[in-house]
Every structure is written in structure tokens, then in C-alpha cells.
């Protein structure tokens, strides 16, 4: 009987202010590794940068190699709701760094929450005036 590849789920939350990479087991119950952009850079303004996301992904891939996880399902998330539905600058860099680290990417999903007429957007009655 051949050995099954160990799979993990990488939840990448990429906003304009930070990038968080959180890897769990397939059920989502157990955290395997969690690194944010703020853990790898000194300046707060660099937390969301592609460089910080790349370094965070490298730290995550080291932890995954220790746990012998070879396959990854990636779920990319933006702030969503009534905020931005576009992932921040660190999302693509994190995915690229994870694939370069030798991990097999099974699939990439977009899981940004979409409002079904939820709460009111900020900006007042007439919206943001420029």
C-alpha cells in the first residue's frame, strides 16, 4: 500500500495593512503554523508588503517540512464584507513563495466573504466626496 501525502490548508488573509498565513489540518481544527507579516519585518508600514508575505511563507514552509506536510490547499481571503473585496499585495507573493518552497499546491480558492445586503458602508448619506 502506497503512502498518502499529508495535506494541509493554507488560509492566506491579505489586506492592505497586513498578510496572515495560517496553516491548519484538513478539518481546520488544529493549527500547524501561523505567521503574519508583522512577525517578519520591523516597520509597521511593511507588514502588507510582498517581501513580508514571502518571508512569512518561507517560515511557514519550514514548519510544514518539520511536520512532513507535502500538499497544500490554498484559500485566499480579502477583508470582504463591506470592505475591500480585492486581496492585498501580499497574497500573490505568499502563493508564489509556497510553491517555490517545494510544496505541491492542490488548488487555490477565493473565500472572501460577500455581503448579501449586510451592513451599511461607511461614508455617510452622500458617500465619500473627493
From Swiss-Prot:
Question: Which residues, if any, are the signal sequence?
Answer: none
Please give one Gene Ontology molecular function term for this protein: structural constituent of ribosome
| Record keyword Transcription present | no
Among InterPro entries, the record links this protein to: Ribosomal_uS11, Ribosomal_uS11_archaeal, Ribosomal_uS11_CS, Ribosomal_uS11_sf
Tell whether Ribonucleoprotein is among the UniProt keywords.
yes
Question: What UniProt keywords apply to this chain's record, in alphabetical order?
Answer: Ribonucleoprotein, Ribosomal protein, RNA-binding, rRNA-binding
The record's annotation in Pfam families points to: Ribosomal_S11
Q: Which GO terms describe its biological process?
A: translation
The GO cellular component terms are: ribonucleoprotein complex; ribosome
Family per UniProt? Belongs to the universal ribosomal protein uS11 family.
Q: Which HAMAP family match?
A: Ribosomal_uS11
**Function, in words:** Located on the platform of the 30S subunit.
Per UniProt, subunit arrangement is:
Part of the 30S ribosomal subunit.
Could you tell me what this protein is called? Small ribosomal subunit protein uS11
Q: Which organism is it from?
A: Thermoplasma acidophilum (strain ATCC 25905 / DSM 1728 / JCM 9062 / NBRC 15155 / AMRC-C165)
